[in-house]
Amino acid sequence: MCHQQLVISWFSLVFLASPLMAIWELKKDVYVVELDWYPDAPGEMVVLTCDTPEEDGITWTLDQSGEVLGSGKTLTIQVKEFGDAGQYTCHKGGEALSHSLLLLHKKEDGIWSTDVLKDQKEPKNKTFLRCEAKNYSGRFTCWWLTTISTDLTFSVKSSRGSSNPQGVTCGAVTLSAERVRGDNKEYEYSVECQEDSACPAAEERLPIEVMVDAIHKLKYENYTSSFFIRDIIKPDPPKNLQLKPLKNSRQVEVSWEYPDTWSTPHSYFSLTFCIQVQGKSKREKKDRIFTDKTSATVICRKNASFSVQAQDRYYSSSWSEWASVPCS
């Protein structure tokens, strides 16, 4: 992640005494200190400067302790562990003048920590963010999992390309599901994003980048995902399934329609379909048929069910969920 360099001036609250850019501004009055995390690590020296023209009678405190850490317009601290992070405030005469929140981003053995989000391991290991699109409109949804329930905040940024980024607007992050996994509870968060100038029929040359900032208490982590819309397409299931018995035959004619959410015109944005008839027993062999049409003739026995799913006809992205209807 590319971080904006802090501008050092008399009104800045925090600046770094190291040339290695180990501190950067996440948002107003919130700073991330990047630390190599190993025993006896030296940490990072940070100098805090009070945002005031006053020079005398200034004191510093950390969080709500009230303990005076030092006096003067500046305070130099050595940040080594989470006990050194938190909200630093400068005061004069009982009045708070300015403050800054320091968060820690850990790096162990050259790898940034990934303690907040759960590895979903699909489609591969170290998959923390998953994204899907129902069509080629430039709208997509991303989600992630965590077992943490409190003191947790997320923010999301997205763009197409990184060197000359094009706009993608993301909404608010929401808690979309809660599940019990053994002895643990799992929380799913999601966000919906829309490419500002999407052209559904155009060839994608640059990938979309999604960046999630995660803060748990005083710990900061970031997670990224890069993809083309065509790679994350997953249509909604086909709709309006209907069965029509054929006279003097064990067969039925089944028909369905494209999902409402799929891109149009369908002559250009075409789907292919997989159909199957499932008997009452789940162990019973299922015969699957692939077709580009929206109807088929099958044998549909009593107590069985007919199912159909859809996939982009010209690109091997994900299949939709199944849509089903009973045979009788």
From Swiss-Prot:
Q: Which UniProt keywords apply?
A: Cytokine, Disulfide bond, Glycoprotein, Immunoglobulin domain, Secreted, Signal
Fibronectin type-III domain spans which residues?
237-328
Top-rank taxon of the source lineage equals: Eukaryota
Q: Which residues are glycosylated?
A: 125, 135, 222
List localization entries. Answer: Secreted
Q: Does the keyword Signal apply?
A: yes
The positions making up the signal sequence are 1-22
A biological process term (GO) from this entry: interleukin-12-mediated signaling pathway
Q: Which Pfam families match?
A: IL12p40_C
Q: Main localization of the protein?
A: secreted
Family membership noted in the UniProt record: Belongs to the IL-12B family.
Function of the protein: Cytokine that can act as a growth factor for activated T and NK cells, enhance the lytic activity of NK/lymphokine-activated killer cells, and stimulate the production of IFN-gamma by resting PBMC. Associates with IL23A to form the IL-23 interleukin, a heterodimeric cytokine which functions in innate and adaptive immunity. IL-23 may constitute with IL-17 an acute response to infection in peripheral tissues. IL-23 binds to a heterodimeric receptor complex composed of IL12RB1 and IL23R, activates the Jak-Stat signaling cascade, stimulates memory rather than naive T-cells and promotes production of pro-inflammatory cytokines. IL-23 induces autoimmune inflammation and thus may be responsible for autoimmune inflammatory diseases and may be important for tumorigenesis.
Its recorded name reads Interleukin-12 subunit beta
